[in-house]
Design a protein with these regions (language model features):
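Metalloprotease/metallohydrolase-associated module, dominated by Zn2+-dependent proteases
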Residues: 1-46, 62-114
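Active-site recognition of the HExxH zinc-binding catalytic motif
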Residues: 49-61
């Protein structure tokens, strides 16, 4: 697992912490410390979704957005599934190999209006 992420210009540390388990959570976002802590006992299959959820928590916190936790959970779970189902596209975007939006090339520029 990665040890840090840049989220909206700030570096956040990513770690595992037993204290997350004692709170009954799989992950925690600690905004005052710029930390995301993940449960060391969660299944590997859960790690990506939980990390993405905590990233959403950090973004919402940094932007001061009021968002119900259930809606944040739905958004993060949905985006995680899109990313998993389309891993090739997301790895290409991350490698700057594929622009997110492809615009058609202009073959000629109109010089007058119709």
């Amino acid at each position: 697992m990665i040890s840090q992420l840049k989220i909206l210009g700030l570096w956040w540390s990513i770690s595992t912490s037993e204290s997350v388990d004692t709170n009954g959570n799989l992950g925690e976002m600690r905004s005052t410390k710029l930390q995301i802590a993940l449960s060391p006992s969660m299944a590997v299959a859960q790690q990506g979704e939980v990390l993405l959820h905590e990233i959403f928590e950090a973004i919402v916190c940094q932007l001061g957005i009021k968002l119900e936790h259930s809606k944040l959970q739905a958004l993060s779970a949905s985006l995680h599934q899109v990313m998993v189902d389309n891993a090739e596209a997301f790895s290409a975007i991350g490698a700057n190999e594929m622009p997110i939006v492809q615009l058609p090339l202009l073959t000629s520029i109109p010089t007058s209006l119709p």
